[in-house]
Amino acid sequence: MSENIRVSEVSDILRQQLEGIETKVQLDEIGTVLQVSDGVVRIYGLRNAEANELLEFDNGIKAIVMNLEEDNVGAVLLGPTDKIKEGFTVKRTKRIASIRVGESMLGRVIDPLGEPLDGKGLIGGELYEMPLERKAPGVIYRQPVNQPLQTGLKAVDAMIPIGRGQRELIIGDRQTGKTSIAIDTIINQRSNYEAGDPVYCIYVAIGQKGSTVASIVNTLRQYGAMDYTIVVAATAGDPAALQYFAPFAGAAIGEYFRDTGRHALVVYDDLSKQAVSYREVSLILRRPSGREAYPGDIFYLHSRLLERAAKIINQEEVAREMNDLPESLKGKVKGGGSLTALPIIETQAGDVSAYIPTNVISITDGQIFLDTDLFNQGNRPAINVGISVSRVGGNAQIKAMKKVAGTLKIDQAQYRELEAFSKFSGDMDPVTALTIDKGQKNARLLVQPQYSPMPVEKQIAILYCGIHGLLRNVPLDKVEDFEAAFLNTLALDHQADVLDVLKTGVINDEVTKAIEETAAMVAKQYS
């Protein structure tokens, strides 16, 4: 049985089907690899490539554009060089190098592109695109540093106080405890996290051994610090480009918390290795070299990175107008946030006048200088008080600490001077002997074991004893025992009327009387 096929029906069906067809044409701008060597590729054909743009090869390896020349583009590889060959095709992503940031990153170990390294699977949750390179907030979007960032270290919080939004350099030879100061500071933020006012921490490991990074992560996990910490790792085995971009990734993550009205702390460990990796990349890209073969813009590299640390103005309508704000954050900006930076620099044989150390000293708001001799003598943290300084943190120090420890720095500097002279003279007048005795006991009080940060109220109480000579009758070798017994007694008998009052930044006659009575009572056991 044959059916009559009407032409009009066929044409209607064809018309309907043709109307539903979507013809999407994606145009990719592609180039060809001319040359590849030591982590750098030269590419022909990418006429419209932008500086810092992300490029992608067919095998998934990424590169970032760093040189724009007349007939080719120089890019740094973010993967193994041996996987890229001459003649490979590479395409533009039309995206500036960036990292996706969000709350779900907390507790994770990532690379500078935001890829997880801890084997715990992909990072989920809501993520925001943050550019690695970004202009620092302008002057009108900032406010002076006025809130303390407690490190939990008596020597730092008393003599070289750090404020939220400050950049404080930690500088010293290898194996002098630079990383320990940073890790102790991160661990000390646990109390803020538990109190509901967290300081989110980003630890950036640049050019370190993988085993060292793993050990640091284990330590942070052991002390419960990974709950509010992100570790960005570019180890010694990673390409130089990844080591160069790692601090920028850390800054971008910190800016996410800062711009959403929260507080963040970023540790760059260390910028000496970043400078070396930038020198390596620049020389292979044939950029002109300057002093110590570093490129001419090495100062600008560190200044533009560290200027991103800031205390943002507490006016939301002004903060929302911030310069160079990423699209992803528009509508989510809040005022009053801060990003504090603790860059670390390694010196050679204590030479702080070398090129990179002097650059970073001049950029930052102060430095904590660690001394090898002090470290070997057992004075840890091995801070050389004479040349360590905090240029803005004093404004952020709590009033009680300022009142108690105001003269400690100069007292300790004078003690070190007198101690050096006393080695040459046999007899000393009573005043000098008393100054040296007090200085020795204060120096012993400032010694603190690793991973045992102390709350600020306990610091004030014990330093009050040292500065006001309440340890006069305590033998030098019993100072640690006195400290432990004194703080235990204070916590048992005077938690509400002394420690809780000191925590608010207040010190009055009732508080000092209770401290003096407790110290006298405990000192009797050791005199």
UniProtKB/Swiss-Prot annotation:
Record-linked Gene3D superfamilies: 2.40.30.20, ATP synthase alpha/beta chain, C-terminal domain, P-loop containing nucleotide triphosphate hydrolases
Keyword Membrane: yes
EC number annotated for this UniProt entry: 7.1.2.2
Top-level lineage group: Bacteria
Cellular compartments annotated: Cell inner membrane
Site (described: Required for activity): S388
Molecular functions (GO terms): ADP binding; ATP binding; proton-transporting ATP synthase activity, rotational mechanism
Topology of the protein relative to the lipid bilayer: Peripheral membrane protein
Reactions catalysed: ATP + H2O + 4 H(+)(in) = ADP + phosphate + 5 H(+)(out)
InterPro entries per record: ATP_synth_asu-like_sf (IPR023366), ATP_synth_asu_C (IPR000793), ATP_synth_asu_C_sf (IPR038376), ATP_synth_F1_a_nt-bd_dom (IPR033732), ATP_synth_F1_asu (IPR005294), ATPase_a/bsu_AS (IPR020003), ATPase_F1/V1/A1_a/bsu_N (IPR004100), ATPase_F1/V1/A1_a/bsu_N_sf (IPR036121)
GO CC annotations, alphabetized: plasma membrane; proton-transporting ATP synthase complex
Keyword ATP-binding applies: yes
Record: residues binding ATP: G172, D173, R174, Q175, T176, G177, K178, T179
Main EC class the enzyme belongs to: translocase
PANTHER family (alphabetical): ATP SYNTHASE SUBUNIT ALPHA, MITOCHONDRIAL
Known function: Produces ATP from ADP in the presence of a proton gradient across the membrane. The alpha chain is a regulatory subunit.
Membership in a protein family: Belongs to the ATPase alpha/beta chains family.
Assembly and oligomerization: F-type ATPases have 2 components, CF(1) - the catalytic core - and CF(0) - the membrane proton channel. CF(1) has five subunits: alpha(3), beta(3), gamma(1), delta(1), epsilon(1). CF(0) has three main subunits: a(1), b(2) and c(9-12). The alpha and beta chains form an alternating ring which encloses part of the gamma chain. CF(1) is attached to CF(0) by a central stalk formed by the gamma and epsilon chains, while a peripheral stalk is formed by the delta and b chains.
Protein name as it appears in the record: ATP synthase subunit alpha
Gene name in the database record: atpA
